[in-house]
A protein has these predicted regions:
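Alpha-helical membrane insertion/targeting regions
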Residues: 1-223
Length: 223
């Protein structure tokens, strides 16, 4: 009994960690959505969202389920037991990821820079937002060609970039505790570090296995 349960429990270590990593950004996003829905005092930090709420609302409504559903795709035993759910969730995950990436780029290009942002962070947002979008497009192309291993690799890359906000909480926290509020240059480094760390971990996961499991099952047309 214990030997059978051990691998099953270990299957949930990574998904649990990823969900935990999503909690702070998800809570912050929920607070933002509540402010926009109910109204809040307009400040320099939020006035751009009230002036043009559509991109941030679409982004938050898609990036939160993207992070949560994506985490469950890393539980092999769960995928095997719930293949139909896995297939359907994969479609939702793909749609959410595309909208999240597109709206991230939209916000970067359309919103005025908040205090603390600068050219370096602006370029980082464009680069990693574009990389996430490209990864998702490549994942779609791979699944249409029934290249399941390639599909899995591209989805891992897209998910890693999409989870950048969670890792950025961890890169910022020590700086806040030891130094204080970061200036423009420090903020760019800390934000960039979150994306780079995630991208590095994604490549490590991919290279660790020569045949990574596809995160999303093929569509009915290709199954």
């Amino acid at each position: 009994m214990a030997s059978r349960m051990g691998p099953r429990r270990s299957d949930w270590a990574l998904p649990t960690g990823l969900i935990a990593l999503s909690v702070v950004p998800a809570l912050a996003g929920t607070v933002r959505l509540t402010e926009l829905a109910r109204g809040a005092v307009i400040t320099a930090a939020n006035e751009r969202f009230f002036a043009m709420p559509l991109p941030v609302v679409l982004h938050l409504l898609t990036v939160i389920p993207f992070s949560m559903l994506g985490a469950l795709q890393f539980a092999p035993s769960f995928r095997e037991r719930h293949r139909m759910w896995h297939r359907r969730a994969g479609r939702v995950l793909m749609a959410c990821g595309l909208i999240a990436a597109l709206t991230a780029l939209w916000m970067t290009l359309a919103y005025p820079w908040p205090v603390g942002d600068g050219e370096a962070l602006y370029l980082e947002r464009l680069v990693f937002g574009s990389a996430m979008l490209l990864s998702l497009v490549m994942a779609i192309d791979a699944i249409r060609r029934r290249k399941f291993a390639a599909h899995g690799r591209w989805m891992i890359r897209a998910y890693a970039i999409g989870m950048g906000a969670g890792t950025q909480v961890l890169t910022h926290l020590p700086y806040y505790l030891l130094v204080g509020r970061p200036d423009e240059s420090s903020r760019a480094v800390l934000m960039g570090a979150g994306w780079v760390i995630n991208a590095g971990v994604a490549e490590w996961i991919i290279r660790r296995s020569s045949t990574p499991r596809a995160m999303v099952f093929p569509t009915p047309a290709s199954s």
